[in-house]
């Protein structure tokens, strides 16, 4: 039985259907009828019906957010008043022809992946009972149970998984466990089958590569949005093993820390109950646990130091490669440039600038005599403006007289009186504060 996803396979909500779905019975009867054997009989009706169902099928997949579907699921989803569309098989065949949809088995076969062998059990693929003749024979419709994939939606969700990884803490390492990645993508992938399809799409785009190591599958991502992933090598496997060691050591340290805290609580309880020997044993156990924690911390620091050095060396290699590329580009760009050519070019530019200045001066001198103004007339006009300015009275606001002192001055006596009031208030507050109890607390002489 086809099970494309977890979304409910029931009829589409009314808001996702066209207006004529409930109002125009005559048109819906036409749309629910089967396609003619040949488009040439009436191409206009054929194209109108095909456009209607193609849009609905693609919109339904995007609304439900699942990348897989089948003919039976679509028939149930588009059921109307007990009737199912009779031409959906032809519509799916057309979508397959256009490349909007693809058979799940064909998609898997198109990916050159060595890990599909262990993924077959997850996909639960049935024997390929259908053949090309059964699909493209007289009926020209796919099998009802055959799973189809929305190609564009699969690509978009695969890109979403890649961005999700890049924005997570897992991206600090080039290699990640498949189980950790599955947990990270739980919100994007409704089921495990979809998750593996998205990984296949990413591998098809050369953004991930997957390897099985000691019974556990690990995933390596490309280090960049447009970069291609490199094959898994010994360094990647070594880094993954170090990461696993770091994780195990961290978990062990956390567990021992909780154990040490429990020993401390037990010692405190025994101390309050007057069981001194039991309290001492609990403290000894706490000390032993703390020594084990210190040993694990030293090992954890060593592992983290190695990882830091590996990441630093990878960064140094990237910088070195960038320097090499920059030097090569600079050499190529400076291939035909010499000092002599540069000096010759500068001389030519200087000569052209001098020539341009001479031409500009020549052109400017042609109209100087006609436009030159008499300097004496300009001086007379300036004197006239100065005389007019001297005759205008200047209105200034009166300057306020400054008093020898300000009205709000405070004398020293007033300040001393205010200070005395503050001192009295502080003394009253100090008398009202209760004194701390000085009674000694009795307990066993254990340092907890």
Swiss-Prot record:
It comes from the Eukaryota. GO terms for cellular component: cytoplasmic side of plasma membrane; ESCRT III complex; multivesicular body; nuclear envelope. Residues 1-20 are annotated as: Disordered. Keywords: Coiled coil, Cytoplasm, Nucleus, Protein transport, Transport. InterPro entries: Snf7_fam (IPR005024). It is found in: Cytoplasm; Nucleus envelope. It holds the Pfam family WHD_CHMP7. Residues 1-12 have a biased composition (Pro residues). GO terms for biological process: exit from mitosis; late endosome to vacuole transport; late endosome to vacuole transport via multivesicular body sorting pathway; nuclear membrane reassembly; protein transport; vesicle budding from membrane. Residues 241-392 form a coiled coil. Belongs to the SNF7 family. ESCRT-III-like protein required to recruit the ESCRT-III complex to the nuclear envelope (NE) during late anaphase. Together with SPAST, the ESCRT-III complex promotes NE sealing and mitotic spindle disassembly during late anaphase. Recruited to the reforming NE during anaphase by LEMD2. Plays a role in the endosomal sorting pathway. This is Charged multivesicular body protein 7. It comes from Gallus gallus.
